[in-house]
């Protein structure tokens, strides 16, 4: 029975509908992959973060199944109570070695890590400097820390330098995505590391969309740019390129020891399920032994980038498997997604507040499980639907 106290929700949902901003769930099946079943139809999946195609890899699945039989389906408690099982420590050691750090700590999700770690490092007398296009979880974590939140223009090192020079904060924390999830471009980590060294600031890098994809060993953008030792807090996820679930922070041992006591999402959450840890360990082995996956992925990326540029989209700054097809209005993005679906392509419309107003888009994401024919087919389908979209202003990246 509906309760009167919730009657206001109907008007809120109608307002979201009117603005083209109402979200809805859309089940896929039977498993994550380059082609999925959606609404009874087989569609090419271009909106997953499964960048290496490992979510359904038989070795990753088998590792998860074996761990479920050996250690159970769930951990049963927080790590600090009775939930610290062998797969947790094994995965943390492997992640620390992969990132070239002394230690690592697992979190329930990337959102958990970003929401909790800043508050363990800074507080009321401190300041956090955050790229204006950082992920929502970073923004929320900065706000929860109660430090002063200073947002600098996207990748604007010059503006950040001035802000750091003027601050009188006790502690300073610079936070950035490595790869920005809605634009696919890369943070200027070398320059940010230089600024942090100069001003005595801590550098926190979210490698969610870079770990597994970039760098000689797939360890992320910091590895690719040779600045791993200059990043204080390496955050990454297990549910994107690694195809599993969860997140981690890697860094100096003293940092990890502090987070064990002060990172509230770690302290007050049930530990990651053992099958998720085992799946991530198996995925890390694939990353280490099959660099050809990354080579193939970036060959597809070059093909997609060239094709989108020919269609007039600004993708010159893209440095990842993420391509923003910016269409402007919510109506155009929704119409494009619907038209592409009719032609066999599954790509979702991304709208405010996820992206700024006026930059609604299709977020196209490639996987090593895709092939060149699928890239070419999508580009042809996109070219065919563009003329029939509602009118809008010039296309520009967000």
From Swiss-Prot:
Principal EC category: transferase
An MF annotation (GO) of this entry: 8-amino-7-oxononanoate synthase activity
Pathway listed: Cofactor biosynthesis; biotin biosynthesis
Primary role: Catalyzes the decarboxylative condensation of pimeloyl-[acyl-carrier protein] and L-alanine to produce 8-amino-7-oxononanoate (AON), [acyl-carrier protein], and carbon dioxide.
Organism for this UniProt entry: Anaeromyxobacter dehalogenans (strain 2CP-1 / ATCC BAA-258)
Protein name: 8-amino-7-oxononanoate synthase
Protein family membership: Belongs to the class-II pyridoxal-phosphate-dependent aminotransferase family. BioF subfamily.
Annotated substrate binding sites: 23, 135, 354
E.C. numbers: 2.3.1.47
Catalyzed reactions: 6-carboxyhexanoyl-[ACP] + L-alanine + H(+) = (8S)-8-amino-7-oxononanoate + holo-[ACP] + CO2
UniProt keyword Transferase, yes or no: yes
Annotated positions binding pyridoxal 5'-phosphate: 110-111, 181, 209, 237
GO terms classed as biological process: biotin biosynthetic process
UniProt keyword list: Biotin biosynthesis, Pyridoxal phosphate, Transferase
Superkingdom, natural source: Bacteria
HAMAP family, per database record: BioF_aminotrans_2
PANTHER family on file: 8-AMINO-7-OXONONANOATE SYNTHASE, CLASS II AMINOTRANSFERASE/8-AMINO-7-OXONONANOATE SYNTHASE
Cofactors, names only: pyridoxal 5'-phosphate
Subunit architecture: Homodimer.
Modification N6-(pyridoxal phosphate)lysine, positions: 240
């Amino acid at each position: 029975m509906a309760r009167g106290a919730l009657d206001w929700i109907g008007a809120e949902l109608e307002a979201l509908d009117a603005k083209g901003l109402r979200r809805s769930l859309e089940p896929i099946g039977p498993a994550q992959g380059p082609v999925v079943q959606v609404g009874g139809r087989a569609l090419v999946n271009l909106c997953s973060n499964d960048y290496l195609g490992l979510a359904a890899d038989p070795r990753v699945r088998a590792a998860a199944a074996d761990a479920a039989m050996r250690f159970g389906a769930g951990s049963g408690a927080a790590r600090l109570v009775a939930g610290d099982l062998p797969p947790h420590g094994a995965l943390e050691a492997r992640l620390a070695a992969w990132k070239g750090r002394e230690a690592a700590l697992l979190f329930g999700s990337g959102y958990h890590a970003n929401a909790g770690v800043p508050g363990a490092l800074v507080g009321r007398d401190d300041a956090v400097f955050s790229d204006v296009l950082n992920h929502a979880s970073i923004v929320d974590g900065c706000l929860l820390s109660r430090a002063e939140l200073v947002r600098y223009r996207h990748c604007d090192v010059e503006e950040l330098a001035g802000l750091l020079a003027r601050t009188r904060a006790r502690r300073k924390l610079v936070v950035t995505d490595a790869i920005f999830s809605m634009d696919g471009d890369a943070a200027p980590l070398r320059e940010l590391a230089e600024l942090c060294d100069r001003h005595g600031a801590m550098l926190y890098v979210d490698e969610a969309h870079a770990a597994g994809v970039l760098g000689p060993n797939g360890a992320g953008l910091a590895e690719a740019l040779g600045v791993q030792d200059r990043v204080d807090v390496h955050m990454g996820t297990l549910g994107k390129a690694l195809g599993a679930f969860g997140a981690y922070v890697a860094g100096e041992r003293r940092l990890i020891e502090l987070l064990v006591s002060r990172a509230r999402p770690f302290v007050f959450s049930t530990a990651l399920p053992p099958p998720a840890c085992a799946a991530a360990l198996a995925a890390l082995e694939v990353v280490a032994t099959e660099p050809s996956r990354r080579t193939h992925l970036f060959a597809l990326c070059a093909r997609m980038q060239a094709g989108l540029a020919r269609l007039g989209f600004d993708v010159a700054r893209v440095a990842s498997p993420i391509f923003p097809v910016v269409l402007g209005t919510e109506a155009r993005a929704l119409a494009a997604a619907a038209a592409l679906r009719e032609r066999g392509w599954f790509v979702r419309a991304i709208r405010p507040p996820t992206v700024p107003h006026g930059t609604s888009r299709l977020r196209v994401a490639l996987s090593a499980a895709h092939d060149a024919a699928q890239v070419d087919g999508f580009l042809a389908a996109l070219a065919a639907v563009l003329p029939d979209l509602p009118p809008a202003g010039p296309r520009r990246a967000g």
